[in-house]
């Protein structure tokens, strides 16, 4: 196809010169039957619009080259190329027309044909079943002929990936990292002059869309940790492996966007939850909050189970699946980086986590009860007897935690070794979250159905063990001071497991779908807790402080257990097998 321009502005005809015009039919038959006239009309209309925006008023004529018969290998001409390869999960036909120069203010909007910011390429995506045109191809990207050994064409539209620094909408690769314009400018300013940023907290501030400007130190620290550098190569010069990784992430974000989990959902706006009621749980499980119906046990109030009183709104937790004819879809990532077809869930990711947590909590308390230890017997236990009793009481809770982890979206899709590492790194942390449901602040005791065990009766001669006892008590107090509902404890527990996937203190693997789930659950927790604290910034810092305290206490448990094993290896071998399996190996 060629474009001719006539009129008084012939010296500006370079505006309409195109570098290529390419499409891929699924079959030779489709290549013959393709509706070329529809494409010609669309591109002609877009070209006229371009000239109108440029104050040019040429008359245009579209010339179509003579058709050629296609042989088995396909045919090519200078204007169009036929490649009869099967293309999975891509539109039937992709057209692009590139112009050498485009006015800065030129934009084409609408659902049929678009041109992006600073782009010089008009793109049509044609479905032969509907003859519908839509799409955009980013700067410096073009479709090429597919090699014979490939079945999927990936256009690296990196702008669908959120900013790696703050989670805002990205604008491309800047200084070697996919970032938004704000973080690009911030990093540029930090490198253009001598700066001396200071962190007012513990150098672990949250950097996101809401508070990215609150701590320049932590923002720059995150930029550097992600690899931003003035010497970083541009996207077009990335290695093949790096490009493939980015393209995989692009596909993931397209899947999420198609199913209602785009960056707006993953990195959702921080706004108060709706005024109408969501999941309401019996808060009387905390003895110092005497509201609701409770069961008195030795002077303390607890509740074993919680039930929803009203349906949970779909947008309560920031991850609202899209709906087609009443059917909701959510994206899952399978092992190896591929994405299966959308599945139909009963609930959104946060609701499923809460439901699984409630089920395991109910099952655990029904089968094993809580705090079945007579506190009068504890002072008479030997050191080995104390460890054995502790491990025996913890063992059924560990089993419930494992079942809960298996129900979290994406967990079972991870490699088995990764699942084991995640459990080793988080089982004790989640045990603290479960225990917080039965902790009474006034008595500083864990209250069960038969007994209440105050921390004052727990005395250890070993310094590491005594420090662990004190820190467990302090950690439970800090969790309970958040006044969390059981639904919020569920979100906190799931977040502690999944956070290790990408965090510096965890196992540090790259599984973008699991990371997206973790972000969704984290935002759900923030939005649910925020009304009680007053502002989002304080909410984030409070929850982060609690998470840090939980992780530190889990490390103390590991250190105390290691000391016990070294000082009394014979007695440590008598500990339950599951407990030893999860805690005697090195923790990630």
UniProtKB/Swiss-Prot annotation:
Keywords: Developmental protein, DNA-binding, Metal-binding, Nucleus, Receptor, Transcription, Transcription regulation, Zinc, Zinc-finger. It comes from the Eukaryota. Orphan nuclear receptor. Transcription factor. Modulates expression of target genes, such as Period protein homolog lin-42 and microRNA let-7, by binding to hormone response elements (HRE). Involved in promoting oscillatory expression of the primary transcripts of let-7 and paralogous microRNAs miR-48, miR-84, and miR-241. Plays a role in normal development and required to regulate each larval molt. Induction: Post-transcriptionally repressed by let-7 microRNAs. GO terms for cellular component: chromatin; nucleus. Residues 52-64 have a biased composition (Polar residues). It holds the Pfam family Hormone_recep. This is Nuclear hormone receptor family member nhr-23.
């Amino acid at each position: 196809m060629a474009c001719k321009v006539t009129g008084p502005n012939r010296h500006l005809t370079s505006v309409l010169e195109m570098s290529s015009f390419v499409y891929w039919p699924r079959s030779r038959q489709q290549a013959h039957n393709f509706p070329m006239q529809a494409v010609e009309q669309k591109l002609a209309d877009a070209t006229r619009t371009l000239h109108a925006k440029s104050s040019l008023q040429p008359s245009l004529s579209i010339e179509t080259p003579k058709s050629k018969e296609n042989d088995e290998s396909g045919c090519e001409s200078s204007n169009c190329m036929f490649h009869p390869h099967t293309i999975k999960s891509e539109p039937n036909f992709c057209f692009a027309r590139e112009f050498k120069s485009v006015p800065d203010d030129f934009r084409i909007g609408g659902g049929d044909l678009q041109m992006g910011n600073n782009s010089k390429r008009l793109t049509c995506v044609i479905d032969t079943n509907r003859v519908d045109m839509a799409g955009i191809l980013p700067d410096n990207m073009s479709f090429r002929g597919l090699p014979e050994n490939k079945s999927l064409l990936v256009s690296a539209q990196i702008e669908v990936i959120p900013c790696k620094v703050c989670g805002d909408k990205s604008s491309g690769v800047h200084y070697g990292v996919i970032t938004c314009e704000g973080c690009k400018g911030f990093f540029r300013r930090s490198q253009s002059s001598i700066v001396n940023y200071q962190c007012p907290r513990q150098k672990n501030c949250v950097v996101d869309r809401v508070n990215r400007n609150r701590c320049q130190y932590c923002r720059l620290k995150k930029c550097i940790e992600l690899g931003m550098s003035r010497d970083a190569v541009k996207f077009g010069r990335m290695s093949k492996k790096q490009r493939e990784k980015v393209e995989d992430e692009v596909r993931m974000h397209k899947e999420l966007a198609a199913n209602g989990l785009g960056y707006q959902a993953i990195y959702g706006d921080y706004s108060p939850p709706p005024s109408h009621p969501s999941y309401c749980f019996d808060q009387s499980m905390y003895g110092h909050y005497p509201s609701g119906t409770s069961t008195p046990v030795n002077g303390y109030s607890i509740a074993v189970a919680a039930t929803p009183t009203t349906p949970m709104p779909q947008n309560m937790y920031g991850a609202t699946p899209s709906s087609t004819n009443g059917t909701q879809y959510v994206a899952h990532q399978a092992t190896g980086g591929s994405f299966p077809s959308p599945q139909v869930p009963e609930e959104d990711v946060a609701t499923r986590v809460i439901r699984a947590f409630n089920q395991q909590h109910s099952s655990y308390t029904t089968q094993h009860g809580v705090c079945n230890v007579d506190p009068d017997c504890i002072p008479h236990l030997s050191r080995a007897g104390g460890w054995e009793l502790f491990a025996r009481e913890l063992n059924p809770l560990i089993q419930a935690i494992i079942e809960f982890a298996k129900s979290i979206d994406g967990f079972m899709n991870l490699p088995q070794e990764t699942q084991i590492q995640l459990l080793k790194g988080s089982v004790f942390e989640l045990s603290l979250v479960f225990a917080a449901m039965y902790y009474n602040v006034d008595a500083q005791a864990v209250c069960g159905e038969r007994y209440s065990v105050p921390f004052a009766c727990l005395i250890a001669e070993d310094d590491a063990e005594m420090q662990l006892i004190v820190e467990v008590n302090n950690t439970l107090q800090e969790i309970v001071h958040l006044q969390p509902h059981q639904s919020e404890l569920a979100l906190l527990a799931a977040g502690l497991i999944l956070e290790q996937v990408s965090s510096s203190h965890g196992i540090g693997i790259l599984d973008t779908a699991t990371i997206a789930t973790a972000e969704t659950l984290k935002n759900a927790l923030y939005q649910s807790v925020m009304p009680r604290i007053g502002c989002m910034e304080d909410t984030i810092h409070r929850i982060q402080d609690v998470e840090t305290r939980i992780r530190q206490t889990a490390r103390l448990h590991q250190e105390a257990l290691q000391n016990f094993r070294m000082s009394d290896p014979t007695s440590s071998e008598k500990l339950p097998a599951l407990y030893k399996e999860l805690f005697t190996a090195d923790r990630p």
